[in-house]
Amino acid sequence: MTKGTSSFGKRHNKTHTLCRRCGRRSYHIQKSTCANCGYPAAKTRKYNWSEKAKRRKTTGSGRTAHLRDVHRRFKNGFQVGTPKGARGPENH
């Protein structure tokens, strides 16, 4: 029996399937855990030894890009309406 390359050709069962949280094919079927995001754990899996992976997944890298300007609007108190100068000269 060989335990190297020739044995790998005989493998045909899927160990990982799609994860319902991160969408990657990293959910280990027998372990019932995701190798990428750590599902079903409450906290998302992330490590400091992979700075690049953290950069890919962090807030503001996808649909939450609008959060970049939330901080600026927070500083101004979430003002609404047109700014004072844009209304034209004020005549009383």
UniProtKB/Swiss-Prot annotation:
Zinc finger feature spans (C4-type): 19-37
State whether keyword Zinc-finger applies.
yes
> What highest taxon heads this organism's lineage?
Eukaryota
The name on file for this protein is Large ribosomal subunit protein eL37
Query: Sorted alphabetically, which InterPro entries does this protein's record hold?
Result: Ribosomal_eL37 (IPR001569), Ribosomal_eL37/eL43 (IPR011331), Ribosomal_eL37_CS (IPR018267), Ribosomal_zn-bd (IPR011332)
Keywords in alphabetical order, please. Answer: Metal-binding, Ribonucleoprotein, Ribosomal protein, RNA-binding, rRNA-binding, Zinc, Zinc-finger
Family from the record: Belongs to the eukaryotic ribosomal protein eL37 family.
Q: Which GO terms describe its cellular component?
A: cytosolic large ribosomal subunit
One of the protein's GO biological processes: translation
User: Which gene does this sequence derive from?
Assistant: rpl37
Q: What does this protein do?
A: Binds to the 23S rRNA.
